[in-house]
Amino acid sequence: MNYMRIIFKKFKARMIVGCILAVIALLAVSVIVFINQASFGRTPRGERLERVMKSPNYRNGEFKNQHETLLMTSDRGRFSGIWEFIFRKIDGLRPEQAVKAIKTDLRKIGRNEEILVWFGHSSYLIQTGGKRILVAPVFCMASPVSFVNKPFKGTELYTPDDMPDIDYLVISHDHWDHLDYNTVKKLKDRIGAVICPLGVGEHFEYWGFDKERLIELDWNEDANLAPGFMIHCLPARHFSGRRLTANQSLWASFLLEAPSQKIYIGGDGGYDTHYAEIGNRFPGIDLAILENGQYNEEWSLIHLMPQYMAQTARDLKAKRVLTVHHSKYALAKHRWDEPLKNAEEMKNKDSLNVLIPEIGEVVALEK
């Protein structure tokens, strides 16, 4: 009897261990299958990887910022910071009412009109010199899963179908809130060329874009787009990654030189010396589009903090400023409308020419 009991206990223990191992194996397989979906893109390979490895900005197996940059700046461990970020409650994190927005028929805007339309967060359309430039369009999902990073009520006015034919798509880095797989796939046949930092082109090639349509640049490289149009790829202080391995593609800001406009496309990034260097190298910037929102003291080196926004605009010597990266998603622990107050303060207290349009409002570009 005791012998049978011992056998049963051993069998039960083995069953429990077997079940645990089976669950772990199932979870591992599920994660592998999940991160191998097309939307996660692909890390550089072949000739592109060779070019990446030759970049002066790629060292010790990853792209680096110009100066040492910690992702988390506090003394606490990363797990502690993530735990607080997930569970700390903030009043006003999301708006109680729908965000004000305007539905503009973009296809009816004449090609010769010099305008900009912001779609919330970091998505906007620039039209200048008869060219249409679409920056970081995110109209479907800002994360790998639909239930994370849900847009605020009222901000989902625009879809890929609302976009006119696009001459140039500009992507500053490959994070999900700047590079939306479903959006770019739906726009694929209506985009002339893609402008992106080194390594990001691998995602687009994987998603079916012809290599000839990819203008993939390292920092301080440029490309002639058309007569009177030049794009300069410039530094930013940030990081990259859609998969488990970070910093395998570059992040960047861009300077667009058009016949009647000089526009700085800031992307994401913390304050550093590159802003003053860009301002000196490219005098007469007509419009600087800067990050404002989704910041946190924990990430103060990789996102532009409010206390540095006015100084950044001055460093760039920009005639006008538009702030983005806000009013659509809650990706950091601050009130949803705090970035709007930051912009108002830059305008009123710092006496800067700051544009504060509603989502979908047509903004005239000064010639």
Regions found by a protein language model. Give the residues of each.
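Cap/insert and terminal regions of metallo-dependent hydrolase folds
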Residues: 16, 27-47, 51-54, 58, ...
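Alpha-helix capping/helix-boundary segments
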Residues: 176, 200-201, 221
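Helix-loop-beta element that forms the nucleotide-linked donor phosphate-binding surface
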Residues: 204-218
